[in-house]
Regions:
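DNA major-groove recognition helix of helix-turn-helix
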Residues: 174, 186, 224-226, 237
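Alpha-helical bundle regulatory/interaction domains
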Residues: 1-167, 177-182, 196-200, 205-216, ...
Length: 256
């Protein structure tokens, strides 16, 4: 059961997404800061991306590997969390182990503590821990960037042809440096594009999309979509349209 407050999250949360300094941009995709205020516990659904995250919350720092499916985070009372989203592919040197070893896990931070996290304070710590350049990490990050930039890449075979590396080479590279397989990353970004189209009011041919993404049937596609987004494609689309209608009503003349 989805929390009825989900559509009203802006009344309870404030989000900031500062960009990293240029010297840290090869490692950090973005920072994220969330402030919240709830009078009773709220289960926040988190949709997965292929990023490793460093989070500072309540005096505790943790590192979360890539999640293979959506997860929930409980927010209660008034609080704040400061997070670092690392670029996909670059975290292995910080971790000192294959990134797949922390997939679907949250572990204590291996970085020095930051009692009062802010962009300058966290960047000072990150600079003190920068690893030596790793050509394999650069390669992995570049392959993920190519997936993001090329919507026509819908299968691992197409990615292999695009990069000149075999599917098994890509599997090993992603397990070591990204933490999850190339098929998952491809499907994740293609599904993100679908949700963007839904947000714009477009209708989606689910059966055709499932075939384009290499699913044997629509049922398997629905299963994976639900694992990522916490609801079926049709349920997700209906909720999006409900939110759009609410926003239009709120913005209409005489609505306030």
């Amino acid at each position: 059961m989805r929390d009825e407050r989900e559509l009203d999250w802006r009344e309870h949360q404030r989000h900031e997404f500062p960009l990293p300094s240029p010297d840290l941009a090869p490692y950090v995709a973005r920072y994220w800061i969330v402030h919240w205020s709830y009078d009773r516990p709220y289960r926040q659904l988190i949709v997965p991306y292929p990023n490793v995250h460093l989070a500072f919350r309540g005096g505790r720092a943790t590192v979360s590997g890539v999640s293979s499916r959506h997860v929930f985070q409980e927010l209660d009372g008034d609080g704040r969390v400061f997070g670092v989203a690392f670029r996909p592919g670059v975290f292995r040197a910080f971790l000192g182990a294959p990134v797949r070893s922390i997939t679907d896990r949250t572990v204590p931070s291996m970085f020095p503590d930051v009692p009062e996290p802010s962009v300058p304070a966290v960047e000072e710590v990150l600079r003190s821990c920068l690893p030596e350049p790793d050509p394999a990490a650069v390669l992995a990050a570049g392959v993920v960037d190519r997936i993001v930039a090329r919507p026509e890449i819908t299968r691992v075979s197409a990615l292999a042809e695009e990069t000149g590396r075999g599917p098994r080479q890509l599997q090993r590279l992603f397990a070591e440096h990204v933490g999850i397989g190339p098929k998952w990353v491809i499907r994740r970004y293609r599904l993100h594009e679908v949700t963007q189209r839904m947000a714009a009011g477009a209708r989606v041919d689910w059966a055709a999309l499932a075939a384009d993404l290499g699913y044997a049937d629509q049922a398997h596609f629905v299963r994976d979509f639900t694992a990522m987004f916490g609801e079926t494609p049709t349920g997700y689309a209906a909720r999006y349209h409900q939110e759009i209608s609410r926003q239009r009503s709120a913005d209409a003349p005489g609505s306030t």
